[in-house]
A protein has these predicted regions:
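Long, hydrophobic N-terminal alpha-helical segment
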Residues: 12-44
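Surface-exposed helix-capping loop/turn segments at secondary-structure junctions
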Residues: 25-31, 113-121, 160
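Short, contiguous alpha-helical
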Residues: 32-80, 123-160
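Short, flexible active-site loop motifs that bind/organize anionic cofactors or intermediates
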Residues: 21, 35, 87, 110, ...
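Active-site rim elements
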Residues: 5-6, 92-98, 139-140
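Structural signal for well-ordered, non-membrane alpha-helices
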Residues: 16-24, 53-57, 61, 102-116, ...
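Extreme N-terminal tail/first-helix region
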Residues: 1-17
């Protein structure tokens, strides 16, 4: 059965299309505004979200295939990686961010849509300082929730 994965894929597709529409509408001035939640520019926040899509899809694939965990990887380490990403991509452009988003979204959509309900229930270690997560939980948090979180912050920052 693929009813759950089909539903998750449709939710993801809708959220991804909405995110692209918002990113495309941002002005140059909007792109440089700083979000209250992340304390990054709107552009860096959008780039962070875009870059995470393919990474999360890869972790979901690892969980469902039973691949060993990535070793010692904590939530604090992720926070450090995100802070470094913000510095490295401070000058990111809307065009490169949209291209990254579309590439990552296509990968994530294909992964989610290709799963069956048994695979969604498989669990694995995502962070060594947190309980294991199922593939479905990671999709809900790391894809759907991540889009909601950062696009909500962007919308609030630019007044949409």
């Amino acid at each position: 059965m693929r009813a759950k994965s089909e539903g998750l894929a449709k939710q993801f597709e809708t959220k991804a299309q909405e995110a692209v529409a918002v990113i495309e509408m941002l002005s140059d001035a909007d792109w440089k505004k700083v979000t209250a939640a992340e304390r990054w520019t709107v552009g860096v926040t959008a780039h962070h979200l875009s870059g995470g899509l393919e990474a999360v899809a890869g972790i979901v694939t690892g969980i469902v295939s039973g691949a060993p965990s990535r070793g010692n990887f904590t939530r604090a380490m992720l926070d450090e990686m995100n802070a470094q990403h913000a510095k490295e991509h401070a000058g990111c452009t809307r065009a490169e961010t949209l291209a990254l988003f579309q590439k990552g979204a296509a990968t994530a959509f294909a992964v989610v849509r290709g799963l069956n309900d048994d695979q969604l229930a498989k669990s694995g270690t995502v962070f060594t300082d947190a309980p294991p997560m199922t593939a479905e939980q990671l999709i809900m948090l790391g894809l759907l929730g991540h889009i909601d979180e950062h696009m909500g912050s962007i919308r609030k920052t630019v007044g949409m």
